[in-house]
Protein backbone atom coordinates (compact mmCIF):
# COMPACT_ATOMS: atom_id res chain seq x y z
CA UNK A 1 0.00 0.00 0.00
CA UNK A 2 1.33 3.41 -1.01
CA UNK A 3 1.91 5.86 1.84
CA UNK A 4 1.92 9.64 1.43
CA UNK A 5 2.48 12.64 3.62
CA UNK A 6 -0.29 14.55 1.83
CA UNK A 7 -3.10 13.39 -0.45
CA UNK A 8 -5.04 16.01 -2.41
CA UNK A 9 -8.46 14.94 -3.68
CA UNK A 10 -9.44 16.78 -6.86
CA UNK A 11 -7.49 17.64 -10.01
CA UNK A 12 -9.01 21.01 -10.79
CA UNK A 13 -7.20 24.32 -10.73
CA UNK A 14 -7.29 24.49 -6.92
CA UNK A 15 -6.03 20.99 -6.18
CA UNK A 16 -3.40 21.16 -8.90
CA UNK A 17 -1.98 24.51 -7.81
CA UNK A 18 -1.93 23.42 -4.16
CA UNK A 19 0.04 20.34 -5.21
CA UNK A 20 2.50 22.57 -7.05
CA UNK A 21 3.06 24.99 -4.17
CA UNK A 22 3.40 22.25 -1.56
CA UNK A 23 5.82 20.27 -3.74
CA UNK A 24 7.82 23.46 -4.37
CA UNK A 25 8.04 24.58 -0.74
CA UNK A 26 8.38 21.27 1.13
CA UNK A 27 10.16 17.95 0.82
CA UNK A 28 7.08 15.77 1.15
CA UNK A 29 5.62 12.74 -0.56
CA UNK A 30 2.49 14.11 -2.22
CA UNK A 31 -0.19 12.58 -4.41
CA UNK A 32 -3.12 14.14 -6.24
CA UNK A 33 -6.22 11.97 -6.66
CA UNK A 34 -8.47 12.60 -9.66
CA UNK A 35 -11.40 10.42 -10.73
CA UNK A 36 -11.18 11.45 -14.40
CA UNK A 37 -8.55 10.50 -16.98
CA UNK A 38 -7.00 13.99 -16.88
CA UNK A 39 -6.98 17.13 -14.77
CA UNK A 40 -9.30 20.12 -15.28
CA UNK A 41 -12.14 18.33 -17.05
CA UNK A 42 -14.91 20.03 -15.08
CA UNK A 43 -15.25 23.52 -13.56
CA UNK A 44 -11.63 24.47 -14.25
CA UNK A 45 -12.32 24.24 -17.99
CA UNK A 46 -16.08 24.84 -18.03
CA UNK A 47 -16.04 28.51 -17.04
CA UNK A 48 -16.01 31.95 -18.62
CA UNK A 49 -12.22 32.11 -18.77
CA UNK A 50 -12.33 35.69 -17.50
CA UNK A 51 -9.18 37.01 -15.82
CA UNK A 52 -10.50 38.61 -12.64
CA UNK A 53 -8.82 41.39 -10.69
CA UNK A 54 -10.08 42.06 -7.13
CA UNK A 55 -11.85 45.41 -7.45
CA UNK A 56 -15.14 43.98 -6.14
CA UNK A 57 -13.83 41.88 -3.22
CA UNK A 58 -14.11 43.26 0.31
CA UNK A 59 -10.68 42.66 1.91
CA UNK A 60 -12.21 42.86 5.38
CA UNK A 61 -14.48 39.90 4.64
CA UNK A 62 -12.31 37.96 2.18
CA UNK A 63 -8.75 39.10 2.86
CA UNK A 64 -6.97 35.97 1.65
CA UNK A 65 -9.18 35.65 -1.42
CA UNK A 66 -8.53 39.27 -2.43
CA UNK A 67 -4.80 38.96 -1.80
CA UNK A 68 -4.56 35.75 -3.82
CA UNK A 69 -6.45 37.27 -6.75
CA UNK A 70 -4.13 40.28 -6.75
CA UNK A 71 -0.83 38.40 -6.43
CA UNK A 72 -1.68 35.52 -8.78
CA UNK A 73 -2.60 37.73 -11.75
CA UNK A 74 0.96 38.23 -12.98
CA UNK A 75 1.92 34.64 -12.09
CA UNK A 76 -0.81 33.28 -14.36
CA UNK A 77 0.20 35.73 -17.07
CA UNK A 78 3.82 34.55 -16.98
CA UNK A 79 2.74 30.90 -17.04
CA UNK A 80 0.44 31.56 -20.01
CA UNK A 81 3.20 33.30 -21.96
CA UNK A 82 5.73 30.54 -21.21
CA UNK A 83 3.33 27.85 -22.46
CA UNK A 84 1.79 29.71 -25.42
CA UNK A 85 -1.61 29.75 -23.71
CA UNK A 86 -3.97 32.53 -24.87
CA UNK A 87 -3.98 35.58 -22.60
CA UNK A 88 -6.06 38.46 -23.97
CA UNK A 89 -6.02 41.43 -21.60
CA UNK A 90 -8.79 43.43 -23.26
CA UNK A 91 -10.29 44.78 -20.06
CA UNK A 92 -13.69 44.62 -18.40
CA UNK A 93 -16.36 47.27 -17.95
CA UNK A 94 -18.89 46.79 -15.16
CA UNK A 95 -21.81 49.05 -15.97
CA UNK A 96 -24.34 50.89 -13.81
CA UNK A 97 -27.80 51.54 -15.22
CA UNK A 98 -28.77 54.21 -12.69
CA UNK A 99 -27.46 56.34 -9.85
CA UNK A 100 -28.08 53.65 -7.25
CA UNK A 101 -25.91 51.16 -9.14
CA UNK A 102 -23.32 53.91 -9.68
CA UNK A 103 -22.89 54.01 -5.90
CA UNK A 104 -21.91 50.35 -6.04
CA UNK A 105 -19.19 51.20 -8.57
CA UNK A 106 -17.89 53.91 -6.25
CA UNK A 107 -17.76 51.30 -3.49
CA UNK A 108 -15.80 49.01 -5.83
CA UNK A 109 -13.27 51.78 -6.45
CA UNK A 110 -12.60 51.99 -2.71
CA UNK A 111 -12.33 48.19 -2.38
CA UNK A 112 -10.06 47.98 -5.40
CA UNK A 113 -7.60 50.49 -4.00
CA UNK A 114 -7.65 48.72 -0.63
CA UNK A 115 -6.68 45.56 -2.52
CA UNK A 116 -3.70 47.24 -4.18
CA UNK A 117 -5.14 48.39 -7.50
CA UNK A 118 -4.00 51.73 -8.91
CA UNK A 119 -5.78 54.42 -10.94
CA UNK A 120 -4.17 52.87 -14.03
CA UNK A 121 -5.89 49.58 -13.18
CA UNK A 122 -9.42 50.86 -12.47
CA UNK A 123 -11.37 54.02 -13.19
CA UNK A 124 -15.00 55.12 -13.35
CA UNK A 125 -16.17 56.50 -16.70
CA UNK A 126 -19.35 58.48 -17.28
CA UNK A 127 -21.73 57.73 -20.14
CA UNK A 128 -19.95 60.09 -22.56
CA UNK A 129 -16.53 58.63 -21.80
CA UNK A 130 -17.91 55.13 -22.26
CA UNK A 131 -19.43 56.13 -25.61
CA UNK A 132 -15.98 57.16 -26.81
CA UNK A 133 -14.57 53.79 -25.78
CA UNK A 134 -17.56 51.59 -26.69
CA UNK A 135 -19.99 53.45 -29.04
CA UNK A 136 -22.65 50.72 -28.75
CA UNK A 137 -22.79 50.79 -24.96
CA UNK A 138 -25.71 52.65 -23.34
CA UNK A 139 -25.59 53.06 -19.56
CA UNK A 140 -25.30 55.55 -16.72
CA UNK A 141 -21.62 54.88 -15.97
CA UNK A 142 -19.08 52.10 -15.81
CA UNK A 143 -16.03 50.90 -13.92
CA UNK A 144 -13.24 50.05 -16.35
CA UNK A 145 -10.57 47.55 -15.24
CA UNK A 146 -7.63 47.33 -17.63
CA UNK A 147 -6.11 44.20 -16.05
CA UNK A 148 -9.05 41.91 -16.79
CA UNK A 149 -9.48 39.87 -19.95
CA UNK A 150 -9.70 36.21 -20.94
CA UNK A 151 -7.57 33.09 -20.89
CA UNK A 152 -7.99 29.29 -20.80
CA UNK A 153 -7.85 28.01 -17.23
CA UNK A 154 -8.06 24.39 -18.32
CA UNK A 155 -4.78 24.73 -20.23
CA UNK A 156 -3.23 26.69 -17.35
CA UNK A 157 -4.21 23.93 -14.92
CA UNK A 158 -2.57 21.32 -17.14
CA UNK A 159 0.58 23.44 -17.33
CA UNK A 160 0.69 23.64 -13.53
CA UNK A 161 0.19 19.88 -13.27
CA UNK A 162 3.31 19.32 -15.38
CA UNK A 163 5.33 21.59 -13.09
CA UNK A 164 4.00 19.73 -10.06
CA UNK A 165 4.92 16.37 -11.59
CA UNK A 166 8.48 17.62 -12.11
CA UNK A 167 8.56 18.38 -8.39
CA UNK A 168 7.67 14.76 -7.66
CA UNK A 169 3.90 14.88 -7.15
CA UNK A 170 2.26 11.58 -8.08
CA UNK A 171 -0.93 12.17 -10.10
CA UNK A 172 -3.34 9.27 -9.60
CA UNK A 173 -5.80 9.60 -12.46
CA UNK A 174 -8.93 7.43 -12.82
CA UNK A 175 -8.99 7.02 -9.04
CA UNK A 176 -12.49 7.51 -7.63
CA UNK A 177 -12.71 7.62 -3.82
CA UNK A 178 -15.12 4.91 -2.64
CA UNK A 179 -14.80 5.27 1.12
CA UNK A 180 -12.32 6.27 3.82
CA UNK A 181 -11.12 4.58 7.00
CA UNK A 182 -9.49 6.84 9.58
CA UNK A 183 -7.16 6.17 12.48
CA UNK A 184 -5.79 8.66 14.98
CA UNK A 185 -2.92 9.70 12.74
CA UNK A 186 -3.76 8.82 9.13
CA UNK A 187 -6.47 8.17 6.56
CA UNK A 188 -6.83 4.99 4.53
CA UNK A 189 -8.44 5.93 1.20
CA UNK A 190 -10.09 3.09 -0.72
CA UNK A 191 -10.92 3.52 -4.40
CA UNK A 192 -13.64 2.06 -6.61
CA UNK A 193 -11.29 -0.64 -7.90
CA UNK A 194 -10.53 -1.57 -4.25
CA UNK A 195 -6.96 -0.32 -4.43
CA UNK A 196 -5.97 1.97 -1.56
CA UNK A 197 -3.39 4.32 -0.09
CA UNK A 198 -2.72 5.97 3.24
CA UNK A 199 -2.01 9.63 3.93
CA UNK A 200 -1.08 11.58 7.03
CA UNK A 201 -2.99 14.62 5.80
CA UNK A 202 -5.79 14.96 3.24
CA UNK A 203 -6.85 18.13 1.40
CA UNK A 204 -10.32 18.13 -0.15
CA UNK A 205 -10.37 20.05 -3.46
CA UNK A 206 -13.11 18.07 -5.18
CA UNK A 207 -15.11 21.05 -6.44
CA UNK A 208 -18.79 20.23 -6.89
CA UNK A 209 -18.16 16.85 -5.23
CA UNK A 210 -16.44 18.33 -2.15
CA UNK A 211 -19.38 17.76 0.19
CA UNK A 212 -19.69 14.13 -0.93
CA UNK A 213 -15.98 13.64 -0.24
CA UNK A 214 -16.28 15.32 3.17
CA UNK A 215 -19.10 12.96 4.12
CA UNK A 216 -16.86 9.99 3.32
CA UNK A 217 -14.74 11.32 6.18
CA UNK A 218 -17.92 11.48 8.30
CA UNK A 219 -17.88 15.27 8.27
CA UNK A 220 -20.69 17.80 7.61
CA UNK A 221 -23.39 15.14 7.86
CA UNK A 222 -26.17 17.71 8.28
CA UNK A 223 -25.11 19.80 5.29
CA UNK A 224 -26.59 19.64 1.81
CA UNK A 225 -25.69 21.39 -1.41
CA UNK A 226 -27.40 22.72 -4.52
CA UNK A 227 -25.94 22.42 -8.00
CA UNK A 228 -26.33 24.93 -10.81
CA UNK A 229 -25.18 24.67 -14.41
CA UNK A 230 -23.85 27.77 -16.12
CA UNK A 231 -24.76 28.03 -19.81
CA UNK A 232 -23.46 30.38 -22.50
CA UNK A 233 -24.93 31.49 -25.82
CA UNK A 234 -22.40 32.09 -28.60
CA UNK A 235 -23.10 35.48 -30.19
CA UNK A 236 -23.80 35.54 -33.93
CA UNK A 237 -21.11 37.08 -36.11
CA UNK A 238 -23.25 40.14 -36.87
CA UNK A 239 -23.27 41.20 -33.20
CA UNK A 240 -20.08 39.59 -31.88
CA UNK A 241 -18.03 42.75 -32.34
CA UNK A 242 -20.49 45.30 -30.95
CA UNK A 243 -18.08 45.87 -28.06
CA UNK A 244 -14.41 44.99 -27.59
CA UNK A 245 -14.35 44.37 -23.83
CA UNK A 246 -16.04 42.09 -21.33
CA UNK A 247 -19.25 43.74 -20.09
CA UNK A 248 -20.65 43.03 -16.63
CA UNK A 249 -23.60 44.60 -14.84
CA UNK A 250 -23.92 45.43 -11.16
CA UNK A 251 -25.47 42.28 -9.59
CA UNK A 252 -29.20 42.59 -8.96
CA UNK A 253 -29.16 39.84 -6.33
CA UNK A 254 -26.00 40.41 -4.27
CA UNK A 255 -27.34 38.23 -1.44
CA UNK A 256 -27.05 35.16 -3.69
CA UNK A 257 -23.85 33.80 -5.28
CA UNK A 258 -24.99 34.47 -8.86
CA UNK A 259 -23.94 37.05 -11.41
CA UNK A 260 -26.25 38.39 -14.06
CA UNK A 261 -25.32 37.08 -17.54
CA UNK A 262 -22.54 39.12 -19.06
CA UNK A 263 -20.84 39.78 -22.39
CA UNK A 264 -17.65 37.74 -22.65
CA UNK A 265 -14.83 38.14 -25.15
CA UNK A 266 -13.22 34.71 -25.11
CA UNK A 267 -9.51 34.14 -25.56
CA UNK A 268 -10.27 32.03 -28.65
CA UNK A 269 -11.95 35.01 -30.33
CA UNK A 270 -15.56 34.00 -29.72
CA UNK A 271 -18.10 36.28 -28.05
CA UNK A 272 -20.57 34.76 -25.61
CA UNK A 273 -23.47 35.83 -23.40
CA UNK A 274 -23.79 34.08 -20.06
CA UNK A 275 -23.71 32.31 -17.78
CA UNK A 276 -27.08 31.68 -16.24
CA UNK A 277 -27.43 29.37 -13.21
CA UNK A 278 -29.78 26.49 -14.01
CA UNK A 279 -30.68 24.10 -11.15
CA UNK A 280 -29.57 20.51 -11.83
CA UNK A 281 -29.35 17.37 -9.74
CA UNK A 282 -25.58 16.85 -9.81
CA UNK A 283 -22.37 18.83 -10.43
CA UNK A 284 -21.74 17.11 -13.76
CA UNK A 285 -25.22 17.33 -15.32
CA UNK A 286 -23.95 19.14 -18.40
CA UNK A 287 -26.48 17.99 -21.00
CA UNK A 288 -29.71 17.51 -19.05
CA UNK A 289 -31.52 18.65 -15.94
CA UNK A 290 -31.69 15.14 -14.50
CA UNK A 291 -28.81 12.65 -14.39
CA UNK A 292 -30.88 9.65 -13.25
CA UNK A 293 -33.81 8.92 -10.93
CA UNK A 294 -31.72 7.68 -7.94
CA UNK A 295 -29.59 10.83 -8.09
CA UNK A 296 -32.69 13.04 -8.19
CA UNK A 297 -34.31 11.27 -5.24
CA UNK A 298 -31.10 11.43 -3.23
CA UNK A 299 -30.72 15.14 -3.95
CA UNK A 300 -34.33 15.90 -2.99
CA UNK A 301 -33.83 14.04 0.28
CA UNK A 302 -30.65 16.01 0.99
CA UNK A 303 -32.38 19.33 0.31
CA UNK A 304 -35.47 18.77 2.46
CA UNK A 305 -33.49 17.33 5.38
CA UNK A 306 -30.28 19.33 5.15
CA UNK A 307 -28.99 22.86 5.49
CA UNK A 308 -30.38 24.14 2.17
CA UNK A 309 -34.05 23.53 3.02
CA UNK A 310 -34.50 27.11 4.24
CA UNK A 311 -33.89 28.35 0.70
CA UNK A 312 -37.10 26.63 -0.39
CA UNK A 313 -39.00 29.16 1.74
CA UNK A 314 -37.16 32.17 0.31
CA UNK A 315 -39.44 33.72 -2.31
CA UNK A 316 -36.64 35.82 -3.83
CA UNK A 317 -34.52 32.71 -4.31
CA UNK A 318 -37.39 30.73 -5.84
CA UNK A 319 -38.15 33.62 -8.22
CA UNK A 320 -34.50 33.86 -9.25
CA UNK A 321 -34.21 30.11 -9.84
CA UNK A 322 -37.38 30.15 -11.95
CA UNK A 323 -35.96 32.89 -14.18
CA UNK A 324 -32.67 31.05 -14.50
CA UNK A 325 -34.49 27.87 -15.53
CA UNK A 326 -36.39 29.80 -18.21
CA UNK A 327 -33.14 31.28 -19.53
CA UNK A 328 -31.93 27.75 -20.26
CA UNK A 329 -34.56 27.30 -22.96
CA UNK A 330 -34.93 30.87 -24.21
CA UNK A 331 -32.23 33.15 -25.60
CA UNK A 332 -34.44 36.20 -25.13
CA UNK A 333 -34.89 35.31 -21.45
CA UNK A 334 -31.11 35.06 -21.08
CA UNK A 335 -30.61 38.49 -22.67
CA UNK A 336 -33.33 40.10 -20.56
Tell where the protein language model's regions lie, with residue ranges.
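Flavin-dependent oxidoreductases
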Residues: 17, 180-294
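Contiguous C-terminal substrate-recognition/catalytic subdomains in enzyme active sites
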Residues: 271, 276-336
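Short beta-strand to alpha-helix junction loop
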Residues: 60, 64-70, 95-105, 143-163, ...
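Glycine-rich FAD pyrophosphate-binding loop
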Residues: 23-45
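Helical element adjacent to the flavin cofactor pocket in flavoenzyme catalytic cores
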Residues: 143-201
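Gly/Ala-rich phosphate-binding loop of Rossmann-like dinucleotide-binding domains
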Residues: 19, 23-24, 163
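Dinucleotide-binding Rossmann-like beta1-alpha1 core, especially the glycine-rich loop
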Residues: 49-128, 133, 260-261, 270, ...
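Beta1/beta-strand and adjacent pyrophosphate-binding region of the FAD-binding site
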Residues: 2-14, 31
